[in-house]
């Protein structure tokens, strides 16, 4: 009996030890909420990574990296604005759970249409390439708009692929997480949501590399096809649709087991979370909120800094890997190593936020982004002077080391974003009231990201419009100066927001 009591005492002490709270702060009774939310994040991010790899690889190799800035400015920004309007109106007539399922299903439907109809029959749906070339000769300053018109379905897929992480993950998923997570649970839950959800980076990176090879298990379904790009696309879309259906099933489970249980309400039409304020009333609250303004600054800074480097990096990757299959395989390798570093930084980040507070968790992302970004720009600008360094390191050309540093920047930028930026950004919404938390979050997350990308895209848009034959290398110096300014503003925004957040928590 004494042995049993002794074992129970040891087990009780172990469960309540400081070490246990650091390594695994989730309680057993919280697992019914924690596990479904973690799995939902995993499959949403799996689709995000697969779609991102497809859209980047296909657009860059089949069109050009220079066209990306035009798509972000004239495609993503208008679509982001329209979505905020649509989303706010849907929230006034539906529950947020219904909005999640409708929007996610719409994305999946479009991906299926593109993969199995629009791309395979692009010659039928797209204008004649010779006609596009004739217009470019006559209107050289509209060159990139004409190229977009000539590949409109691929461009639309790129836009929808860019909106998936912003809308489905950043807005809808985290809105659900904020809704069912208590303030005292957030520091423990959010970093571990990321820790387990982001393991899909390892999985999706492996999946991408696997499908980029000549042999995979879906190949017999598409054995009759001759176009390797079409086979690649249909294989990925099949996986995306399966993953999307799992997301819908998990969301339904969370809706029934967690949301309904928390509210203890039997009928959906009795829910209290349906928002009745108008879009104009919501906009007034958002625009007059200094607190939301600084959250928006953080989102804009991250999006803009990524946009300033991304096009230049992809142009270098295309030079090294001109074939779509090789390009997407490289993308898979970068994703895999992003996953490795994300898991490490998410584990450390959870302890960092709990021990040192929100500020230190939030400041790491801009610091890492700045250091890695400046390295990449410097090596790119001085590419012609890297001969001795390249020979010393044993590389065949400066391009190889530049692509390596660009990949390193991407790994660092994305890993700290996934593990720290997302978690700390979502924590600052929790003290807000329901109106700001829902509609304010929609405006900040969607508009902030799109405006940030658009500002970076404007610089590139103007450059490529005035000089139609220019490429990313020609404007690398301008991009670097802008990048440094953005990072400085980002650091300032973190400092001010930290002060405001701590005041609201104390209240």
Swiss-Prot record:
Record membrane topology: Multi-pass membrane protein
Annotated TM spans: 31-51, 67-87, 99-119, 130-150, 154-174, 192-212, 231-251, 292-312, 333-353, 357-377, 393-413, 451-471, 474-494
Gene name of the encoded protein: tlcB
An annotated Gene Ontology molecular function: ATP binding
Lineage of producing organism: Bacteria, Pseudomonadati, Pseudomonadota, Alphaproteobacteria, Rickettsiales
Native organism: Rickettsia prowazekii (strain Madrid E)
Family: Belongs to the ADP/ATP translocase tlc family.
Coiled coil: none
Protein name: ADP,ATP carrier protein 2
Purpose: Provides the rickettsial cell with host ATP in exchange for rickettsial ADP. This is an obligate exchange system. This energy acquiring activity is an important component of rickettsial parasitism.
Keyword Isomerase (UniProt): no
Assigned GO CC terms: plasma membrane
Keywords on record: ATP-binding, Cell membrane, Membrane, Nucleotide-binding, Transmembrane, Transmembrane helix, Transport
Compartment annotation: Cell membrane
């Amino acid at each position: 009996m004494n042995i049993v009591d002794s074992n129970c005492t040891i087990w009780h002490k172990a469960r309540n030890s400081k070490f246990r709270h650091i390594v695994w702060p989730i309680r057993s009774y919280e697992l019914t909420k924690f596990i479904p939310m973690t799995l939902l994040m995993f499959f949403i991010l799996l689709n995000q990574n697969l779609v991102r790899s497809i859209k980047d690889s296909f657009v860059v190799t089949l069109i050009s990296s220079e066209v990306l800035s035009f798509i972000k400015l004239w495609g993503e920004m208008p679509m982001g604005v329209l979505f905020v309007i649509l989303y706010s109106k849907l929230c006034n007539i539906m529950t947020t759970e219904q909005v999640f399922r409708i929007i996610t299903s719409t994305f999946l439907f479009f991906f299926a249409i593109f993969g199995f109809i629009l791309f395979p029959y692009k010659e039928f749906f797209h204008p004649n390439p010779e006609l596009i070339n004739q217009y470019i000769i006559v209107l050289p300053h509209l060159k990139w708009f004409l190229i977009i018109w000539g590949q409109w379905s691929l461009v639309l897929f790129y836009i929808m692929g860019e909106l998936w992480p912003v809308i489905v993950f950043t807005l809808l998923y985290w809105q659900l997480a904020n809704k069912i997570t208590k303030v005292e649970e957030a520091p423990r839950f959010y970093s571990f949501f990321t820790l387990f959800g982001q393991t899909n980076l390892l999985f999706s990176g492996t999946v991408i590399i696997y499908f980029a090879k000549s042999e995979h298990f879906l190949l017999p379904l598409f054995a009759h096809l001759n176009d390797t790009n079409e086979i690649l696309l249909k294989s990925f879309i099949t996986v995306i649709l399966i993953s999307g259906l799992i997301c819908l099933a998990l969301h339904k489970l969370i809706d029934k087991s967690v949301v309904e249980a928390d509210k203890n309400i039997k009928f959906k039409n009795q829910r209290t979370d349906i928002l009745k304020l108008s879009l104009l009333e919501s906009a007034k609250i958002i625009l007059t909120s200094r607190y939301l303004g600084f959250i928006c600054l953080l989102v804009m800074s991250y999006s803009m800094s990524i946009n300033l480097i991304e096009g230049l990096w992809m142009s270098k990757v295309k030079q090294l890997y001109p074939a779509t299959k090789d390009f997407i395989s490289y993308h898979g390798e970068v994703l895999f190593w992003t996953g490795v570093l994300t898991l490490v930084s998410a584990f450390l980040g959870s302890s960092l936020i709990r021990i040192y507070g929100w500020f230190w968790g939030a400041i790491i992302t801009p610091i890492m982004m700045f250091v890695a970004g400046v390295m990449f720009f410097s090596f790119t600008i001085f590419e012609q002077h890297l001969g001795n360094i390249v020979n010393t390191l044993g590389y065949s050309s400066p391009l190889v080391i530049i692509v390596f540093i660009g990949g390193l920047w991407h790994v660092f930028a994305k890993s700290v974003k996934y593990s720290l930026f997302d978690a700390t950004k979502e924590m600052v919404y929790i003290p807000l009231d329901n109106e700001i938390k829902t509609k304010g979050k929609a405006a900040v997350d969607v508009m902030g990201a799109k405006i940030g990308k658009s500002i970076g895209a404007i610089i590139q848009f103007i450059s490529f419009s005035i000089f139609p034959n220019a490429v990313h290398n020609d404007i690398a110096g301008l991009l670097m100066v802008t990048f440094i300014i953005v990072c400085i503003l980002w650091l300032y925004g973190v400092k001010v927001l930290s002060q405001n957040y701590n005041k609201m928590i104390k209240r």
